[in-house]
């Protein structure tokens, strides 16, 4: 027997409800009554009031109309001050929206019509059809009353409609004055209510960022500028530069000079840099500016305008010239207690491996000794002492002389040059150590001494120009290895300096029909480095003619790739400026034409994150290979160069490269590890580490070599234990293959670079600024790695020393106003992006407290853990001057 359904049971009730909802009542009045019964007394009262107001608004008596409109306005205003859900008045007025619109259209021009337009503008917020922009139209016809009284949501909606209307009017070329008056009001409202980001967005949409300058004040200019600088990364040119210009002006307006200087450096605008110096009157602050310029690797001459007093000017110029770098670096090394020299064996840790590899050939092979030379140079870089080259000559075993002669011909060049690396940044001592090798009759030794002079002077400027004085005499030597030593030395010592004396000496070599190809290639590369990012026409012409003069056979040589690279470096990061040269490159011999095109494109857009260029380069990678084409290598490296500027693009690029690996042809697979190495340089991301580890066992030895070198690059200067372990295992895996073992050793040298105190990352100042010289050094090495066998495993292994351009201490060293190091507690943790967030959120997470000097890993940020001092730099990296806080009270 079927159970009798209980009319009060839940199920039955639910069914009944369903039935009532499904069948619409014929009598709509009953339905309305039912709805009204659901309302609370207050809501019912409000609904009835609003309906009454709607009727009164249509009353012929203007007095009644006015009272009704004012009452309606009050109800709506009270409810829209905060919008968590659609306010009740807007709900209840929904059915009457059409009626009010019709009545508004019929009304004669009067203040009452404007009042009604204001109310309709707010109602349109929830009621107008998509894309009609009714809210804005009624606002423009309404009164001039305060826009903010209707609440944030209304203002935000209006801003969105203005942006669309602006675009349409620009297309029609009609007047936008009425819109701009409204924009003024909205921006003013946003800036007063901590919504700086929305104000900036609106002004970007209506292309009038200059308005910001009127509306920023002391409380919100920092947040505004932070947003401007981070938004600039995602804007197409030339908008990005305009946005940064505004940020610069705001910083100058509020005397926030260190931040202004950073933007001036980013824009590469020398006038702005000078303006920062002339606007600021505080000498100690100027010292901090000098440290910032020195870290950027910029050649900069101070003049009377910037610093009036000669003595002060000299002291400041010393800082710009980086003459304090070695001292600071060694202070850090002593503090962390890593001064003791390390031998290559300390790095290889062969005792940790099982017997096979460690009991390998015990005879000294030239290649093993060469790799030990490099490992020794990179690991002890800048420490001024090691156990192979700087040992006093009286100790018999392993003295410098002995070690030098364990290397064969061109190996001696790298061995002597390694002295420059060990004495890095300490010019006087370094030149003293190298001096004796100039008197040698052995050309490779002299070449090494010349290169060593260049390395020791890297990034250090000196009034008496010792590098030029020593090297210029050897530029036209008969022996090509000596010439290359001098030319490379000049390129490294004067990178980024745009030194005309050197141009006068090196340019003739490019067009000398009798000069050997390798000398011409290195001359082009050195000129590219000295004039990096300068777009210098003369140098570009010289390199273009040199490329046109090459014979078919020479264009097939491995070193020829340095000519297009030298040309590309002239336009590093300069975007459209490269176009004329790129057109000329289309006339080159087809053997080098595409290679040149890819190199120019990737250099010009390096660090810009330009999505369209990434797509162009990916398209090149997708083409099928025609025999003899070598242009896809630089295209893959170009992908990394363009996309490395910000985190989002970088992660996207890593994923794209995974696809390129899967579907690309063999020559592309050889370049992918190098691109990954550049994207994560000195920043060992686990996913990339695993990919490279997989590729390091690839059946194609070129892919394996590139992956091994890249493992070294992503771990460069980090002492990363996991990468060190991988490389140790690879050294036992490849113990029979001299070439691959050489690559493993080089990578081990990179990982332990400067005993873990250095970084190769070309970005600094919290990834805002890109040092062009540093990137030039890294890219040169990567292009050389595209043909490992001919260049790095051939006789041009000293190309590895170009990396010195990117080597910088990853330290934060605090000094007092007289530039003496002081130790203060600082918190070091993962940096958090707080741009556009409300309030004052924490800028670091997961921090530890240390005493300065401290090391900063990739993605880390430091902040002072004491209020006793105020830092003069907004970004705590490198040398930071602290001044005592006058308001500080000891507890």
Curated annotation (Swiss-Prot):
InterPro entries: 26S_Psome_Rpn1 (IPR016643), ARM-like (IPR011989), ARM-type_fold (IPR016024), Proteasome/cyclosome_rpt (IPR002015), RPN1_C (IPR041433), RPN1_N (IPR040892). The keyword Ubl conjugation applies. Residues 14-37 have a biased composition (Basic and acidic residues). GO terms for molecular function: enzyme regulator activity. Disruption phenotype: Normal phenotype. Acts as a regulatory subunit of the 26 proteasome which is involved in the ATP-dependent degradation of ubiquitinated proteins. This is 26S proteasome non-ATPase regulatory subunit 2 homolog B. It comes from Arabidopsis thaliana (Mouse-ear cress). The gene is RPN1B.
